[in-house]
């Protein structure tokens, strides 16, 4: 396997296959599954390894987003472009999020994964989902919008809220651009600061196999592979639908915009394996942003589209929400009228916005949706509680591919896509190690 550094004059370095990160993560996942299966108690005890890695990644997310967005916007000569990029991104997010919801609903009608279970809602354990429902009730649309505005300029960096960091970064970047040449020393400082920050990302990623091992060992050790058997139809249908969405829907979008979805998936395979191991798409956020810039998307587009997409472009979560809601209705023998399903769709469109890219967020979002739609019992969520963790991986994987696709598409719409860089990246082995944010590959086009 050859690793290519695209910076000028950089030597070509060869790596043995076992030194490549995605191979290490894949091996770690397999070992974690085996440990959790054969030694469940020991597997459960590995949970701190996964949690620790997630905390390490979250530690660096805020500075990565702030520096990428701020320097990207500050470099823009046309400030109207910021609003234009954001507007195009939101249109893309709305269209494909809605399409994902509809596809989940249509497939559920065709396959009927919950039919024949004949569950009495009164017999379900409502206490098991009470915590999720409480969190869902606390999450209103108004509260979500107000929460984007931080208490202070520094509080987002303490709390790690992605949208708050993005909000501050956009405002600060606009301020730098409006001040003009006088702000150039600050912009230069941020560009220089980006180098050690992205080098730190590369250092932290060395711990990815340990995190993936711990998270997977815990998942299998606690929930067991057998817990998935009883609800295999739902889980299998969800996985198949997600693959269908990526290959067919996103595949058509990719082909129309001049690239291959299969090559894109291959290009971000390290990030996908990281997400698979941790069930959190946030774990791959820093390296995904870096890779999308290497693939020819300008820094300004990546800085706006990727972090925003983590709250507004969750294709996997959207498929899951309508599919899970209809599964519960079918299992409880509750017929849904056309009006009920339209209401479910509309509520899901709203409640899915702002769902965080962390484990369990999709379940909380589902609780928020069902608590507004009276026809489907919230207590029915107890039916899928045991296998939600297994569906969480697929949700996160689909979300990640969706956001990578969105970055390229919006960059192309905006004329900010280096097609040569995209071709080189997607036809390489995906191992592009340079983390220097001042290199040509990382600048706006």
UniProtKB/Swiss-Prot annotation:
It is found in: Cell inner membrane. Keywords: Cell inner membrane, Cell membrane, Membrane, Symport, Transmembrane, Transmembrane helix, Transport. Disulfide bonds: none annotated. GO terms for molecular function: fumarate transmembrane transporter activity; malate:proton symporter activity; succinate transmembrane transporter activity. The keyword Metal-binding does not apply. The keyword Cell membrane applies. One of its GO terms (cellular component) is plasma membrane. One of its GO terms (biological process) is L-aspartate transmembrane transport. Its main location: membrane. InterPro entries: C4_dicarb_transport, Na-dicarboxylate_symporter, Na-dicarboxylate_symporter_CS, Na:dicarbo_symporter_sf. It is a multi-pass membrane protein. The chain crosses the membrane at residues 17-37, 56-76, 91-111, 157-177, 200-220, 233-253, 319-339, 367-387. NCBIfam families: PRK01663.1, PRK13027.1. Belongs to the dicarboxylate/amino acid:cation symporter (DAACS) (TC 2.A.23) family. Responsible for the transport of dicarboxylates such as succinate, fumarate, and malate from the periplasm across the membrane. This is C4-dicarboxylate transport protein. The lineage of its organism: Bacteria, Pseudomonadati, Pseudomonadota, Betaproteobacteria, Burkholderiales.
